[in-house]
UniProtKB/Swiss-Prot annotation:
Binds 1 divalent metal cation per subunit. One of its GO terms (molecular function) is 2-C-methyl-D-erythritol 2,4-cyclodiphosphate synthase activity. Involved in the biosynthesis of isopentenyl diphosphate (IPP) and dimethylallyl diphosphate (DMAPP), two major building blocks of isoprenoid compounds. Catalyzes the conversion of 4-diphosphocytidyl-2-C-methyl-D-erythritol 2-phosphate (CDP-ME2P) to 2-C-methyl-D-erythritol 2,4-cyclodiphosphate (ME-CPP) with a corresponding release of cytidine 5-monophosphate (CMP). The keyword DNA-binding does not apply. Its EC number is 4.6.1.12. Keywords: Isoprene biosynthesis, Lyase, Metal-binding. SUPFAM superfamilies: IpsF-like. This is 2-C-methyl-D-erythritol 2,4-cyclodiphosphate synthase.
């Protein structure tokens, strides 16, 4: 068994879509990044890659490579799932947290879980997503950005 941890953060800006867990969430701001800036999927990918000792998303999808400009993170997650399979790793479970003051995530979490399970070809009960605020503290609490953390367990 191998445990992996992932973390990602992006700044909220105007004129960008807010995409988390592959879900476009109605909001006046979106996350700034080279790809679609889906912090939830980025944290999940880093936890999976870390558990398998396969580097991180910066290694596999560098922001200096124009082919990842505006990339759909669900497609990147599918690639990570294939990479795990190729290296004989199976996902036992993933537990992830979105940290954002606004907007409310609860209505979107079921679809996020479905998207992640489908992309990784795992059962829905193997992926948990939850959300919390930081009670107005720090950059997430002030609405400057959104972060996400993920932990996973892999078996070989």
């Amino acid at each position: 068994m191998r445990i992996g941890m992932g973390y990602d953060v992006h700044k909220l800006v105007e004129n960008r879509d807010l995409i988390l867990g592959g879900v476009k969430i109605p909001y006046e701001k979106g996350l700034l990044g080279h790809s679609d800036a889906d912090v939830l999927l980025h944290a999940i990918m880093d936890s999976l890659l870390g558990a398998a000792a396969l580097g991180d998303i910066g290694k596999h999808f560098p922001d200096t490579d124009p082919k990842y400009k505006g990339a759909d993170s669900i497609k990147l997650l599918e690639f990570v799932g294939e990479l795990l399979n190729k290296n004989n790793y199976k996902i036992s479970n993933i537990d992830a947290t979105i940290i954002a003051q606004r907007p409310k995530m609860a209505p979107h979490i079921p679809t996020m879980r479905e998207n992640i399970a489908k992309a990784l070809n795992i059962d829905l009960d193997q992926i948990n997503v939850k959300a919390t605020t930081e009670e107005g503290l720090g950059f997430t609490g002030s609405g400057e950005g959104i972060s996400s953390q993920s932990i996973c367990l892999l078996v070989k």
